[in-house]
Amino acid sequence: MNILFINGSPNKNGNTASLASQLLEGHDYKTLNLTDHVIGSFGQNLEQDELDFVISQLEQADMIVVGSPVYWHNICGSVRNVLDRFYGKVKEGSLKGKTLYFIFQGAAPEKWMLEAGEYTMRRFASLYGMEYGGMITNTKEAQEFTKEL
């Protein structure tokens, strides 16, 4: 199984990456750190834009884990930017058959913050034909989900 972890955190080895390693323990997976790639905002035309590379990595994966710290009560900007850029660029259903998991962690997020982030990721999965596997917010949940993978 080809597993891709998309790390939206600017800290490549921080809490988001740590939860991913706990979730994916015992599995081979590839990490794509969004901070390593130039991805312009929706409507920008940057010559060095790497969104097509990110999309190609998603298309090659069987399972996708998107990780984001909670910033300003929601998903971080780098993940939001990628989701925004999918609009019009990627056909609905083009990621059909893939499973999407969402790592969403922060220093003490309130329930409504987690619900808002999860709503976004559920809609993203649904729009592009993916099965939504669930949201992981802490070590205990990562260990529970690991058993299902």
Which role does the model predict for each range below?
Residues 1-92, 122, 126-149:
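N-terminal beta1-alpha1-beta2 submodule of the flavodoxin-like/Rossmannoid cofactor-binding fold
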Residues 96-135:
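Short, glycine-/small-residue-rich phosphate/pyrophosphate-handling segment
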